[in-house]
Every structure is written in structure tokens, then in C-alpha cells.
UniProtKB/Swiss-Prot annotation:
GO terms for cellular component: chromosome; chromosome passenger complex; cytoplasm; kinetochore; meiotic spindle midzone; microtubule; midbody; nucleus. This is Inner centromere protein B. Component of the CPC at least composed of survivin/birc5, incenp, cdca8/borealin and/or cdca9/dasra-A, and aurkb/aurora-B. Interacts (via C-terminus) with aurkb (via N-terminus and kinase domain). Interacts (via N-terminus) with birc5.1, birc5.2, cdca8 and cdca9. Interacts with mtus1. Residues 90-99, 332-343 have a biased composition (Low complexity). Its main location: nucleus. The lineage of its organism: Eukaryota, Metazoa, Chordata, Craniata, Vertebrata. Residues 512-725 are annotated as: SAH.
């Protein structure tokens, strides 16, 4: 038996773990996969202008985004094309609200309708008092199956075209799935996939409790509400307004039934009875409905965070203006019933109203749970608050249109309805004022679970506050903006523009006139005091603005040197200004003052603690300073000792260096003495060698002179012998010539004799002997040429001047023998003598005078003094002129 229980327990644990795993897959991993698929589709779509929103932008990309205009039209941009002003003034809040509502309409049509946890409902003092008397309503059980959910009757207004398409879709769905039967007319936009997603979101698996969001100045300003989407001319664009008519909690299954949208062509505003109406301001600040599976892109992208910050800023500015007007209305207690009725008419005056049947229970309000903030969202960017879609009536009676004339007919002053209408108006106005003051007056039970709101007790007309004129103009502006935001198709025939102000003077005068007068005087006094306070605040604001202008001027002077820090400082200053403004407005309520006092006490404690820490730190620093001083003194002493030791070492080193220098100087002196001795010895040796060389040269010269004298004598003797030989030869030549002359004369005489004898004797038979004939011996046939006897030249004269062309001489076999003085000892002696005793050319030839250029170039013409050359002429410097030759130096 124990084993069976263990097995069953194990199966239960396994099933629970499996369900938790499946739920984790559905709620976490599938969401990530769907987001990744969505981003992939965006990336691979044809629209490449869209930037991935998961990536953060740098400041330069933000500035470039503002400057660069896209060629393709951007559906998220303002159609007017004007730049959004960064100032949070009351002049342009309506345009920003209009842009936000248009973006919410576009995003609401693109995203699938999913269920999300509701926001915590703010509890006012009246709600807290009412919650004590009335216990909270018990939640109904969730539907068990999708068929039970679909069998709920939902009232949807559709057009004729949508009705035909819905019928066709219904027939197709009946053929495909015969089990799917419902009374709801299908709409083309709402398919089975959407219904299955809704059922999965509200299915049986238990959802873990989400911890409540801590109450902070940022979170406490967000009011809870229901979102009701009214139809427009097209089923794609729907107007989103906030329905705040329901006060009691509503079961979760009714929230699922609220998902189908109203797609009628006529616009409607959420107005129930007059007692259940809320301020028109709440209908403007709307938010997109998001689910528990909210898009990660909208949660973590910078674009969504910037949009949420813009919405929060607009909403805070609206709440600030409302709180100011509320403070003025609370201080001034005007008791006129006409102001009461006019204020009621200002609150509930709208273009068209859509009311619920009288039988509809007013307690059906869904219970709102606190939404957990994402851990990845920063303090600057807040996650979107999830607003549930308002509940449609479960009654079978269809919604009916009510105009102002119908309300006036219903509100005719009968004895029964007059008091009811007055009470309803009182309740409506008190509830509107309470709802407007939710953000500025938090109650003690703000974090407690919401309870049912009981109607306030009847309020006399004297307690109702007349709104100031600027609120009337504000409501007029709201109505005009609502009218401008509508599409042309959404304006039907039943829409009529009425005035906000209605003069509803009460019929019965109040009998307590004296009390009223006293209250009126008190109200006037309070109003004057409030006016004085307002003027003082205005003066303070002016002073603060002057100080801010002064700071801005100083910033403008510093921005040239601090270009990069200036942008960050401006952003920080803007953020601080907004925070200061919001903090100043929040400080008007007593709760904030109490918190501030508590904070001041805590600050005093922290300051005391900080002072103690500073004193302790100062003591520690003093001790550390003393210890450091001691260490410094010790370090200085060690340093002085080191310096003294270093000086002593330097002195020893200097003495060593001086001793070394002395030793080196002594060695140098000894070396110089030794070198001088060596030089003297070498000089003496050189002089000895020179003397020996001179003596040897002298001996050689003497020997050469002797040889030369001997050669001269031999030459003279040779000349004498030659002279004698020449004279003897001349004498012999004369004798020979004289003998020849004598012989010739004798021959001539003999011939003459023979000729004479021949002439006398006969010549015919005479035989002549040629050999012995004197004719043959009379002359020579070829006489020898006469040669001039060559005179014997000087042996030292080699005819170098005459025969200077010796290039053909062979050095090994010269034509003339080399003389003795050109080789051998004579040549060496001549060279050594010329080396040691050079010839004094100046003494031999005299001093050579420098040439005078005036004498060489005696022409003087003007054109000679002009330089016609393009070259740059520079005279040589005077310091270099002594290097020039004497003959080439210029004389000045």
C-alpha cells in the first residue's frame, strides 16, 4: 500500500513537473522564439527602412535620425511633418496626445489581442472608507473549456459589409468544424488562432503570483483603467479610449469575453449613467493593450522606452495641471448650484454617448493585479502598463444611442427623478474629483487589494466646487482634439456638438442662507489667500526662471570648451528640471510632506552618522598623517645619512682620482723626459748620419771632380791629337792636290804636242792602244761625290736639341750611350745634394715681379665695366688670396 502511495505521489510530482516545464516553454521560450521569428520576418521583408529595435542607438545615430529624412513615407511619423517641441508646456500637449493616440491606434491593429494582468488600482480615501463597509467580490471560476468561453454572448456592432463577410466566414467555419458552435458573429480580424491564444492565456495552469510593484513617485502616478476600443470607418483603425465606469471587481472569464472589438462605424465614448462617469481627461491618455506575453521588442527596445517616457511625461503634465486646478477648487468653496450643474455638464459632455441598459450590474469591474516590471528595464524607461479591455454588457438588450435631448427628456424635474438626478450628479462629480486626485493624494491602503467602491453620501450643492475658467477652456480644447482625431467615416448623423456649460440652477433655494453666506465669505478669504500664495509661487517661479536663464547663459559660455560634456549636462539639467517640477507638485499633498519630513529625519541621522564617520576618518587621517610625518622624518634622516655617506664616498673617490691623476701626471712627465731624451738621441744620430752623408757626398763630389778633370784632360789631349791629325791630313791633301795639278798640266802639254804632231802626220793607217792611251787616264767616268769632312762633336752633346724626336728610341738599345752623370753614383749624389741643399732660384734668377694688369689690358671702355653674363659672379674671399700663386694674385 505504501508503494502504491509512493508511486501515485511520484506520478503526481512528474505530472506537475511536466506541466511546469510545458508552461515554462509556453511562457518563456516560445515567446522568445516568436519574437525571433517576428524580427526575422521584419529583416527579410521588403521594407528595409525599418531599423532593428533591439539594438541601442548611440547619440550620434539619434542626431542623425533627426537630420536625415526618409524618402519613403513613415507611417509612425507625424503627418503634419512638424518637429516635436521638447518643451513640456500646456500649449502643445494636445498635439502630443493626438500623436500618441494615433500611434496607439496603429499599434493596436497590428498586434494580436492578448490578455494581460491588470494594473494595481489606486485607492483614494473615499475608496478606502467604502472598502471597509463593502467586502470585495469573489472571483468567478475560469471557464473549463474553449467551448464554454465561446458560448458567452458578446454584443458587437458591425457594418453591413462586415456582416456579410462574417456570415460567409461562419459558413466556412461550420463546414470545417461542425463541433464549433457559438452565438458570437465572427469577425474577419478575430480568428480561431486568436481565440486559442486567449484560452491558452486564461487556461487551467495556475499562474504564479506576481509580486506587487513598490510604490515609487514614478509608479504611483499610473492609474488603473479599462480600455474600450470603439469602431471607426474602417476595421483596421479603431479609436482607443479608457472606460472607467465600472468600480467593482469583475471575474477573469469576463475579461476574456471583452476581447472582441466593437467595429461599428460610429464612434462612442464610454459613458454610463451620470453617476458613473469620469473626467474626459482620462479618455485621452490611453495605452495599448498588451498581454502577459508582451512583446520583448516593446519591453526592451529603446524606441518603446522613448515612447513610454513621452507618454509618462504627457500624463504627468496632465496630472500636474489637474492637481493645480483641484487645489484651487478645494480652496475656493463656491456654493452656487449653477456652477455645480455647469461643472457636471463639462465633465459628461461628449460628442456621442453609449450607455448600458439599466439592468446591467454596476459592480462588474475586473480585479486588477500588479504587474511585475521586467528586470532588464532601466529607471529611465518604464515598461508599459497593461490595460485590460473594458467589459461589454452581458445583457441581451442591445446598446442604444442616447443624445442630449433624450437625456434632457429623461431628466425632467419630476418629484422622484429630480433628487435622483441631483444625487447622481453629486456622486459623479465627487467620483470624478476623487479619480482626478488619485495620483496626487495617495492613501494608506494603496498597496492593499482593491475593494468595491460604495457610492459617496449625498453632497449638498453648496459643497460642489465651480471649476475655474481655464479648466473650461481646457475641456473645450479636449473636445476639439477628440473631434479632430476622428476619421471622416466615424462622424455619423447622430453626432451633435453641444456646449460644455449648461445653466442648471437648482429649483429649490437652500433655507440655510446665513450659513451659506458665512461659508461664502470663508471661501472668498481662502481664495484670496490661495491667490496670494499663487502670486508668491509665480514670483518664486520667475526668480527660479531667472536663475535658470543665468545658468543657461553660463552654460552657453562654457559650451565652446566643453562640447562633448555640454550635451550630457543639458540632458541632466532637463531631467533635473522635470524631476524638480514633479517633486514640487507632489509636495503639495500632506503625505508627501510627511514623507519628506521622514526623509529629512533619515537624512539627519545619515548626516550625524556621516559626521561621525567624517570625525572618525579625520582622526584616522590625523593619525595616519602623524605616522606619515614620522615616516617622513625617518626617511629624511636616512636620506641625510645616505647623502653624508655618499659625500664621504665621493670625497674618497675624488682623492683617489687626484692620486691617480698625480700618478698619471708623473708617468706622463717621465714619458715626456724619456721622449725628449729619445728625441735628442735621434737628433744626434740624425746629425751624425747627415754629417757622414755630407762627408761621403763631399768625397764623392771630389772624386767626381777629379774624374771630371781627368776626363777634361783626356778630352783636351784627344782634341790636340785630333787637331794634329787634321792638320797633317790637310797638309797631305794639299800636297796631293798640288801633284794632281802638276800632272794635269803636264798631260795637257803632252796632248797639245800630240795634236800638233798628228795634225802634221797622215792619220789613216794608225793603230791606237786603249790601255796605254793617255785619253783613258785623263778623267774618271763617274767621279766620287765630295764629302765635307765631319767635325768631331762634343762627347757630352748628344744632339738633343737637334734630334729631339726620340720617341722611336728603344730604351734597352738607345741610339746613344747613357752618360755617366745620368746613372750610377753621380746621379745619386746630385739628387741627394738637391734634396738637402736645394737651389735658391730667387738668388740665381732674382725676384719675379707680379704682372700689372693695367699694362696687359690697357684698354679702358665703359662697356668693359658691365657684366653681360647671366652667371652669378662672386669674388674670392680675401682670406683665400694668399693661397693663389704670386703671378695670379690681383693687385688692388
Amino acid at each position: 500500500m505504501n508503494d502504491a502511495e509512493c508511486l501515485s505521489h511520484l506520478l503526481q510530482v512528474c505530472s506537475r513537473k511536466t506541466e511546469e516545464f510545458v508552461r515554462t516553454l509556453d511562457t518563456k521560450h516560445m515567446v522568445w522564439l516568436l519574437e525571433i521569428e517576428e524580427e526575422a520576418r521584419k529583416m527579410f521583408s521588403s521594407d528595409f527602412n525599418a531599423e532593428p529595435e533591439l539594438m541601442p542607438k548611440t547619440p550620434s545615430q539619434k542626431r542623425r535620425r533627426k537630420k536625415r529624412t526618409s524618402i519613403l513615407p513613415d507611417e509612425n511619423r507625424d503627418p503634419s511633418g512638424r518637429r516635436i517641441s521638447r518643451r513640456r508646456s500646456s500649449a502643445n500637449w494636445s498635439s502630443s496626445v493626438r500623436r500618441l493616440s494615433v500611434r496607439n491606434q496603429i499599434k493596436a491593429n497590428d498586434d494580436s489581442i492578448q490578455e494581460g494582468p491588470a494594473q494595481p488600482k489606486r485607492m483614494t480615501r473615499a475608496r478606502a472608507q467604502a472598502s471597509i463597509m463593502c467586502p470585495p467580490a469573489v472571483e468567478q471560476a475560469l471557464p473549463e473549456s474553449p467551448s464554454q468561453l465561446c458560448q458567452k454572448s458578446v454584443q458587437v456592432k458591425i457594418s453591413e459589409h462586415e456582416r456579410r463577410s462574417a456570415e460567409q466566414k461562419l459558413r466556412e467555419s461550420e463546414i470545417e468544424d461542425s463541433e464549433m458552435k457559438t452565438d458570437v458573429q465572427p469577425i474577419p480580424e478575430i480568428t480561431k488562432d486568436h481565440i486559442s491564444e486567449i484560452m491558452n492565456a486564461a487556461g487551467p495552469p495556475p499562474i504564479p503570483d506576481i509580486p506587487a510593484v513598490p510604490v515609487t513617485p514614478e509608479n504611483k502616478s499610473r492609474a488603473a483603467g479599462k480600455l474600450k476600443i470603439s469602431g471607426s470607418s474602417t476595421p483596421i483603425q479603431t479609436a482607443a479610449v479608457v472606460d472607467l465606469t465600472c468600480e467593482s471587481p469583475r471575474p477573469a472569464n469576463e475579461l476574456v469575453n471583452e476581447q472582441p472589438l466593437n467595429l461599428s462605424n460610429e464612434s462612442a465614448t464610454p459613458t454610463g449613467s451620470k453617476s458613473d462617469r469620469r473626467s474626459v481627461r482620462r479618455s485621452l491618455v490611453v495605452r495599448k493593450s498588451s498581454s502577459r506575453r508582451a512583446s520583448l521588442v516593446s519591453q526592451f527596445s529603446l524606441v518603446s522606452k522613448r515612447e513610454s517616457m513621452t507618454r509618462e511625461a504627457v500624463r504627468k503634465s496632465i496630472r500636474q495641471s489637474i492637481s493645480k486646478k483641484k487645489a484651487a477648487m478645494e480652496t475656493s468653496s463656491t456654493s452656487s448650484q449653477r456652477s455645480c450643474h455647469s461643472s457636471i455638464e463639462m465633465v459628461d459632455d461628449e460628442i456621442t454617448i453609449k450607455i448600458r441598459p439599466e439592468t446591467a450590474p454596476s459592480e462588474t469591474v475586473s480585479e486588477e493585479a500588479p504587474a511585475a516590471e521586467s528586470p532588464r528595464s532601466s529607471l529611465r524607461s518604464r515598461a508599459f502598463k497593461k490595460i485590460a479591455i473594458s467589459n461589454l454588457s452581458e445583457s441581451e438588450e442591445p446598446p442604444r444611442r442616447v443624445t442630449r435631448q433624450m437625456v434632457a427628456v429623461d431628466a425632467e424635474p419630476t418629484p422622484e427623478t429630480a433628487d435622483d438626478a441631483q444625487n447622481n450628479r453629486r456622486k459623479s462629480y465627487k467620483r470624478a474629483v476623487d479619480e482626478l486626485s488619485d495620483d496626487e493624494r495617495p492613501s494608506e491602503g494603496e498597496c492593499s487589494p482593491p475593494r468595491k467602491k460604495t457610492p459617496s453620501p449625498p453632497c449638498p450643492p453648496s459643497k460642489i466646487v465651480k471649476p475655474p475658467p481655464h479648466m473650461k477652456s481646457f475641456l473645450h480644447t479636449v473636445q476639439k482634439n477628440q473631434f479632430l482625431m476622428m476619421t471622416p467615416g466615424s462622424i455619423g448623423k447622430n453626432i451633435t456638438l453641444k456646449s460644455f456649460i449648461k445653466r442648471n440652477t437648482p429649483l429649490k433655494p437652500d433655507p440655510k442662507s446665513e450659513e451659506k453666506e458665512r461659508q461664502r465669505l470663508d471661501a472668498l478669504r481662502k481664495k484670496e489667500e490661495a491667490e496670494l500664495q499663487r502670486k508668491q509661487k509665480i514670483e518664486e517661479g520667475k526668480k527660479r526662471k531667472q536663475e535658470e536663464l543665468k545658468l543657461r547663459r553660463e552654460d552657453r559660455l562654457r559650451k565652446v570648451l566643453q562640447a562633448r560634456e555640454r550635451v550630457e549636462q543639458l540632458e541632466e539639467e532637463k531631467k533635473k528640471k522635470f524631476e524638480q517640477k514633479f517633486a514640487q507638485i507632489d509636495e503639495k499633498s500632506e503625505k508627501v510632506r510627511e514623507d519628506r519630513m521622514a526623509e529629512e529625519k533619515a537624512k539627519k541621522k545619515t548626516m550625524v552618522k556621516k559626521q561621525e564617520e567624517v570625525e572618525c576618518r579625520r582622526k584616522q587621517e590625523e593619525e595616519a598623517r602623524k605616522l606619515k610625518a614620522k615616516q617622513m622624518e625617518e626617511e629624511e634622516r636616512r636620506h641625510q645619512e645616505l647623502l653624508q655617506k655618499k659625500r664621504e664616498e665621493e670625497e674618497m673617490e675624488r682623492q683617489k682620482k687626484m692620486a691617480e691623476a698625480k700618478r698619471l701626471a708623473e708617468q706622463e712627465r717621465e714619458r715626456q723626459v724619456f721622449a725628449e731624451k729619445e728625441r735628442l738621441r735621434a737628433e744626434r744620430e740624425r746629425e751624425r748620419i747627415e754629417r757622414e752623408k755630407a762627408l761621403q757626398l763631399q768625397r764623392e763630389l771630389e772624386r767626381a771632380a777629379q774624374e771630371k778633370e781627368q776626363q777634361r784632360r783626356e778630352a783636351e789631349e784627344r782634341k790636340k791629337r785630333e787637331q794634329q791629325q787634321r792638320l797633317e791630313q790637310e797638309r797631305l791633301e794639299r800636297l796631293r792636290t798640288e801633284q794632281e795639278v802638276k800632272r794635269l798640266q803636264e798631260e795637257q802639254q803632252r796632248k797639245a804636242k800630240e795634236q800638233a804632231a798628228a795634225a802634221a802626220a797622215p792619220v789613216m793607217n794608225v793603230t791606237v792602244d786603249m790601255q796605254n792611251s793617255p785619253a783613258c787616264e785623263s778623267y774618271e767616268m763617274t767621279p766620287k761625290s765630295y764629302k765635307v769632312p765631319s767635325v768631331k762633336a762634343n762627347a757630352d752633346n748628344y744632339g738633343m736639341d737637334l734630334n729631339s724626336d726620340d720617341s722611336t728610341d728603344d730604351e734597352s738599345q738607345p741610339r746613344k750611350p747613357i752618360p755617366a752623370w745620368a746613372s750610377g753614383n753621380l746621379l745619386a749624389q746630385a739628387v741627394s745634394q738637391q734634396y738637402y741643399k736645394p737651389i735658391d732660384a730667387d738668388h740665381m734668377y732674382g725676384t719675379i715681379d707680379s704682372p700689372k694688369l693695367e699694362e696687359l689690358f690697357n684698354k679702358s671702355k665703359p662697356r668693359y665695366f658691365k657684366r653681360t653674363s647671366s652667371a652669378v659672379w662672386h669674388s674670392p674671399p680675401l682670406s683665400n688670396r694668399h693661397h693663389l700663386a704670386v703671378g695670379y694674385g690681383l693687385k688692388y
